[in-house]
């Protein structure tokens, strides 16, 4: 039994064919798809979403400094050594000491972080043994340990000096050169410029009180600690994230830069750090176990610059929708409409072998096949 091959079938070539179907239903549907897709690509992707911008996250540095108030508050309810004018404190009050910024700030010299003390456990410790002995340990001198609060820490002011840099666009600014905002508890962007404090005012450094910083994060030092409801945050300490978000994409002018502070308390976290002061010998020391407000600055944001390749990619990625629209209309024409048989036979054509006269078979809507010969002249 022999096998015969038709080389024209084996090496057949499929090509694109354009058929103009005079059907208003298909035409209006396809035109609607095209208008919607062009509007999506040009208006939404390219213009509204700024698909012509190459964006990057800036880097930067943050420097902070602390300053005590000119006049301290008194009669504080959390101070056991002060008059309270009949007010009560919901937690156990402690003795209060008035410290300046040099004492209240610890640790010092850290990048992108800031810490100020709210409570200290002070103790004098002695090691009446030789450190060659593995059991040698420091112990508190009897009666030397005491807890104190740092009075009126909320009135201290913090200066925040930050700089941002975006490598691709070459943008570099200091906070003094920009206008900025801080988010309040309602999520609104606000500026501050009163009573010696300022936030986001171009030409002025950012200065706010510790109390303002806490309030923007929804934190009070006299609310319950997140890990022990029997003591306050003033007693245990707190850790805050301060996000500095830079942007030049909030308008259609990439020369307009701004930054926004947002303060977020880290849940279920307190802060303490030990400070050791050696006295007359290494066997004698003062131990300050500090609890306080730990602020961690995180610089982020979106800096954009015009980039032709990014615009081209935005346009090309949307053009794929045009092929989808054409496919949907084609399938509607050849599978769903009453004229689907005629439309299908017009869309798909299989020629006779090149060795035979060219013919074309078309199916009518009634299902009848009509054979055309010499189709080169059709």
UniProtKB/Swiss-Prot annotation:
Effect of deleting the gene: Response to extracellular ATP remains the same in p2xA null strains. p2xA null cells have been reported to have compromised contractile vacuoles and defective osmoregulation, and exhibit cell swelling. This is contradictory to other reports. Quintuple p2xA/p2xB/p2XC/p2xd/p2xE null cells exhibit a slight delay in their osmoregulatory response, but are ultimately still capable of regulating their cell volume in water. Extracellular purinergic response to ATP persists in the quintuple null cells with no alteration in the kinetics of the response, but the magnitude of the response is lower.
A UniProt-annotated Pfam family: P2X_receptor
Record keyword Nucleotide-binding present: no
GO molecular function: ATP binding; ATP-gated ion channel activity; GTPase inhibitor activity; intracellularly ATP-gated calcium channel activity; ligand-gated monoatomic ion channel activity; small GTPase binding
Keyword Ion transport included in the entry's annotation: yes
Keywords: Ion channel, Ion transport, Ligand-gated ion channel, Membrane, Receptor, Transmembrane, Transmembrane helix, Transport, Vacuole
Known role: P2X receptors are ATP-gated ion channels that play a role in intracellular calcium signaling. Not required for the purinergic response to extracellular nucleotides. Inward currents evoked by intracellular ATP and ATP analogs. Exclusively selective for ATP over other nucleotides. Insensitive to P2 receptor antagonists PPADS, suramin and 2',3'-O-(2,4,6-trinitrophenyl)-ATP but inhibited by nanomolar concentrations of copper and sodium ion. More permeable to ammonium than either sodium or potassium ions and less permeable to choline.
Species assigned in the record: Dictyostelium discoideum (Social amoeba)
Region span, Pore-forming motif: 290-303
Name this protein carries in UniProt: P2X receptor A
């Amino acid at each position: 039994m022999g096998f015969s091959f038709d080389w024209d079938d084996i090496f057949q070539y499929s090509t694109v064919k354009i058929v103009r179907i005079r059907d208003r239903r298909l035409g209006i549907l396809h035109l609607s798809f095209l208008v919607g897709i062009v509007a999506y690509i040009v208006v939404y992707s390219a213009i509204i979403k700024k698909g012509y911008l190459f964006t990057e996250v800036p880097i930067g540095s943050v420097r902070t400094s602390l300053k005590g108030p000119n006049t301290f508050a008194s009669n504080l309810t959390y101070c056991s050594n002060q008059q309270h004018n009949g007010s009560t404190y919901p937690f156990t009050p402690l003795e209060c000491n008035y410290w300046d910024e040099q004492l209240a700030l610890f640790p010092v010299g850290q990048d992108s972080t800031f810490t100020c003390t709210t409570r200290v456990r002070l103790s004098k410790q002695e090691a009446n043994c030789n450190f060659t002995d593995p059991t040698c340990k420091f112990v508190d001198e009897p009666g030397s340990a005491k807890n104190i609060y740092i009075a009126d820490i909320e009135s201290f002011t913090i200066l925040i000096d930050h700089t941002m840099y975006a490598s691709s666009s070459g943008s570099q600014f200091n906070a003094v050169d920009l206008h900025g905002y801080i988010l309040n508890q309602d999520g609104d962007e606000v500026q501050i410029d009163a009573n010696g404090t300022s936030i986001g005012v171009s030409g002025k450094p950012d200065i706010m009180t510790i109390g303002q910083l806490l309030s923007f994060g929804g934190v009070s030092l006299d609310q319950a600690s997140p890990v022990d409801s029997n003591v306050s945050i003033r007693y245990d300490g707190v850790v805050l994230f301060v996000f500095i978000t830079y942007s030049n994409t909030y308008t259609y002018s990439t020369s307009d830069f701004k930054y926004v502070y947002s303060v977020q308390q880290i849940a279920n976290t307190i802060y303490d750090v030990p400070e050791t002061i050696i006295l007359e010998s290494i066997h004698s020391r003062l131990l300050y176990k500090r609890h306080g407000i730990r602020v961690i600055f995180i610089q982020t944001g979106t800096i954009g610059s015009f980039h032709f390749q990014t615009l081209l990619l935005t346009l090309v990625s949307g053009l794929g929708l045009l092929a989808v629209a054409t496919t949907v209309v084609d399938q509607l024409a050849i599978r769903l409409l009453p004229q689907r048989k005629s439309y299908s036979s017009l869309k798909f054509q299989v020629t006779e072998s090149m060795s035979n006269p060219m013919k074309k078979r078309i199916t009518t809507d009634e299902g009848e096949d009509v054979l055309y010969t010499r189709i080169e002249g059709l």
